[in-house]
C-alpha cells in the first residue's frame, strides 16, 4: 500500500515536470534599456555658420546653454528615468563645459551634465565601471582657447574667476548609466574611437566620435551593452561619416557572440539618402552620384540591419516614432518644421528617426516605445525605451572590443591655433582703437 502511494506520487511529480511550461520552470532573464540624447544645450549648426568669428560662435553657444539650464532639465530627465526604471541607459551628448581665466590658468569644470543627472537621480544610478575604467567615452570637443572662445558671463564668472569674461569650451561624450544595484555585476568596460572623423576647420578643429561599452551580468547572464553617437555632419556626394563609423562599429562587434545591445543616436533615418525633392527639414543626407537614394552603404541604420542587428522598434518607418525635431531652445518645433512633420504624420513636430536600440545574439524585444515626445522638453530628441528577454543563456564571454585612439593634436595644429589667435587678437585691438 505504501509502495503504491510512493509510486503514484513519483509518477505525478514526473508528469507535472513534463507538462509544466518551460517559462514557469525557469523564467528567462529580462531587462529594460533606455536611449537618451541629453543635448549639449546649444545649436552647433548656427555656431558653425558664425565661424571664423570664433568669439561670436562661442558667445552664441554659451548664451543658449544658460537659457537651456541643465539644472532644470536634469530634474525632468531624472523624473522620466524614475518613472520607467531602465536597468541600463545609453547617454549621448553627455556634456562637460570648461572655462579658464587666461592662457596660463587651468581649465575649470563649470557644467557636467552627467554628474548633474546622476545627482538628480539621488544615487540610484551610476556610470558602469570596472578596474579603473568608466563607461564614458569623450568625443567631440572644443578646448577653451583665450581670445578665440572668450565669452562674457559676469554673474557666473565673477564668482569663479573674479572677472566678467573667460575662455570656454566643451566636450561631449557617450556614457552608460546603470542601476546602482548592477554596479557589482559589471564584468569589463571599454572606450574606443572611430577612425572616420570630420574636420570643421582643417588641422584646427576635428570632430571625433566613438563609443563606450560594458559587459554586465543580468541574472547571471553576461550581456554586452554599447552606446554611441555617430556623426551628424555630411558632405555632398560623399559617403556620410555616420555610415563609415557604423561600418567600423559592425566590424568591431563581429567577434561578439554573447547577447548584445547597441544603443544610440545614429544620425541616420531609414529614408536617407533622400531624393532632392523629398521633404527634408532636418537636412539629412540627400541623394548624389556617390550615394543614390536609399543606398545602404550611405545609411548607418541600413548597414546595421544588413549586418544582422534587430531594431527593437518601434517601427522606424512609422512617422509617429520619429525622434528628432525640437528647436534649440526646447520650446517646440519651429513653425516650418511642425508643418512638415504634420504632413509626414507626426503631430508633435519630429521629422526624422535618428535614435535606436539594436540587438543581436539572442536578445528578444518584448516591448518598445518612444518617450519624451511631448512638451515640456528636457532635450531636443525624443528617446527610446525597450524591454528585452535573454534567449541566448549559454553563450560564453566574448573577448574585449578593439581599442582605437584619436590622433593627438599635432605640432602644426598648435601652430595654427596660435596664429589664428594672434590674428583675431590683432583685429580686436584695431577695432578697440578705432
Predicted features, each with a name:
Residues 420-434:
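C-terminal membrane-anchoring or membrane-association module
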Residues 187-188, 237, 251-261, 268-394:
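Metal-dependent phosphoester-hydrolase catalytic domains
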Residues 33-38, 73, 77-103, 214-216, ...:
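Active-site beta-strand/loop signature of hydrolases that rely on acidic residues for catalysis
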Residues 25-157, 391-399:
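N-terminal, active-site-proximal structural segment of metallo-dependent hydrolase catalytic domains
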Residues 135-223, 227, 365:
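A well-ordered secondary-structure block
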Residues 8-21:
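Bacterial N-terminal signal peptides
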Residues 400-416:
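Juxtamembrane/start-of-transmembrane alpha-helix segments at the extracytoplasmic/lumenal side
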Residues 60-67, 192-203, 229-242:
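Surface-exposed cleft-lining segments at the edges of enzyme active sites
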Amino acid at each position: 500500500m505504501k509502495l503504491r502511494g510512493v509510486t503514484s506520487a513519483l509518477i505525478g511529480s514526473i508528469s507535472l515536470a513534463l507538462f509544466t511550461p518551460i517559462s514557469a520552470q525557469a523564467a528567462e532573464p529580462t531587462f529594460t534599456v533606455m536611449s537618451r540624447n541629453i543635448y549639449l544645450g546649444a545649436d552647433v549648426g548656427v555656431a558653425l555658420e558664425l565661424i571664423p568669428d570664433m568669439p561670436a560662435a562661442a558667445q552664441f553657444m554659451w548664451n543658449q546653454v544658460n537659457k537651456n539650464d541643465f539644472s532644470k532639465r536634469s530634474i525632468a530627465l531624472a523624473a522620466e528615468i524614475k518613472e520607467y526604471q531602465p536597468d541600463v541607459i545609453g547617454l549621448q551628448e553627455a556634456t562637460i563645459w570648461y572655462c579658464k581665466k587666461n592662457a596660463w590658468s587651468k581649465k575649470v569644470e563649470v557644467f557636467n551634465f552627467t554628474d548633474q543627472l546622476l545627482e538628480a537621480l539621488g544615487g540610484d544610478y551610476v556610470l558602469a565601471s570596472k578596474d579603473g575604467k568608466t563607461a564614458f567615452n569623450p568625443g567631440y570637443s572644443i578646448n577653451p582657447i583665450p581670445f578665440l572662445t572668450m565669452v562674457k558671463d559676469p554673474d557666473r564668472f565673477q564668482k569663479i574667476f573674479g572677472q566678467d569674461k573667460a575662455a570656454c569650451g566643451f566636450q561631449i561624450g557617450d556614457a552608460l548609466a546603470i542601476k546602482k544595484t548592477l554596479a557589482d555585476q559589471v564584468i569589463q568596460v571599454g572606450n574606443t574611437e572611430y577612425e572616420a572623423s570630420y574636420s570643421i576647420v582643417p588641422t584646427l578643429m576635428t570632430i571625433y566620435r566613438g563609443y563606450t561599452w560594458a559587459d554586465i551580468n543580468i541574472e547571471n547572464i553576461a550581456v554586452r551593452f554599447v552606446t554611441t553617437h555617430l556623426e551628424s555632419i555630411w558632405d555632398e556626394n560623399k559617403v556620410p561619416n555616420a555610415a563609415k563609423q557604423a561600418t567600423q562599429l559592425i566590424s568591431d562587434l563581429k567577434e561578439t557572440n554573447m547577447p548584445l545591445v547597441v544603443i544610440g543616436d545614429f544620425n541616420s533615418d531609414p529614408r536617407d539618402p533622400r531624393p532632392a525633392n523629398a521633404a527634408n527639414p532636418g537636412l539629412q543626407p540627400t541623394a548624389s552620384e556617390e550615394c543614390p537614394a536609399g543606398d545602404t552603404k550611405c545609411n548607418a541604420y541600413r548597414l546595421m540591419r544588413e549586418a544582422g542587428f534587430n531594431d527593437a522598434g518601434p517601427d522606424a518607418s512609422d512617422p509617429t516614432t520619429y525622434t528628432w525635431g525640437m528647436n534649440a531652445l526646447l520650446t517646440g518645433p519651429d513653425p516650418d518644421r511642425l508643418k512638415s512633420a504634420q504632413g509626414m504624420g507626426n503631430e508633435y513636430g519630429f521629422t526624422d528617426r535618428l535614435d535606436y536600440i539594436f540587438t543581436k545574439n539572442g536578445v528578444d524585444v518584448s516591448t518598445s516605445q518612444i518617450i519624451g515626445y511631448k512638451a515640456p522638453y528636457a532635450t531636443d530628441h525624443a528617446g527610446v525605451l525597450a524591454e528585452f528577454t535573454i534567449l541566448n543563456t549559454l553563450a560564453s564571454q566574448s573577448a574585449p572590443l578593439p581599442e582605437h585612439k584619436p590622433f593627438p593634436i599635432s605640432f602644426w595644429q598648435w601652430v595654427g591655433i596660435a596664429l589664428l589667435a594672434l590674428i583675431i587678437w590683432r583685429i580686436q585691438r584695431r577695432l578697440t582703437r578705432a
